[in-house]
Amino acid sequence: MRTGAALLVLYAGMTGAAGIALAAAGTHGAELAALATPAHFLIMHAAAALAAVAIALRASRPGLFLTAALLMLAGVTLFSGDVSMRALLQERLFPMAAPVGGTTMIIGWLIAAIGGLTELFAAPRD
């Protein structure tokens, strides 16, 4: 596995762990229920990033899938970090962090879709 892919797997693992921790914390009081959304987003995008890295290892254009994974992880970090900070500390990460993170996740998903489209027309690898 290349270094970039390995670092993305590390990032995804840490993101998934953070999602589980937030989900667990969210069960300890009604005031922490707002942690459910960032927890779910972290877990879902960690799994999606792992899948994108796995696909990249066999793809004809691996850079698209690695970029998609990075954008998904960076976006979910911003989005979930901002929503979690507002729930826990009543402070924002920085102005527009959640919308920037959400937009970054969307772009990551669209790049994954473009990667899938390019694989439809790629020469078979044997």
Where in this protein do the model-derived segments appear?
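Short, charged juxtamembrane terminal tails flanking transmembrane helices
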Residues: 1, 118-126
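N-terminal signal-anchor transmembrane alpha helix
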Residues: 4-28
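Hydrophobic alpha-helical transmembrane segments of polytopic
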Residues: 8, 12-16, 68-75, 101, ...
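Core segments of alpha-helical transmembrane spans in multipass integral membrane proteins
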Residues: 14-22, 34-58, 70-81
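Non-cytosolic membrane-interface motifs at loop->transmembrane helix junctions
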Residues: 33-40, 91-103
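Hydrophobic cores of alpha-helical transmembrane segments in multi-pass inner/ER membrane proteins
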Residues: 44-52, 104-115
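Juxtamembrane helix-break-helix junctions at the cytosolic face
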Residues: 53-65, 87-91, 122
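Membrane-helix boundary connector in multi-pass membrane proteins
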Residues: 82-97, 115
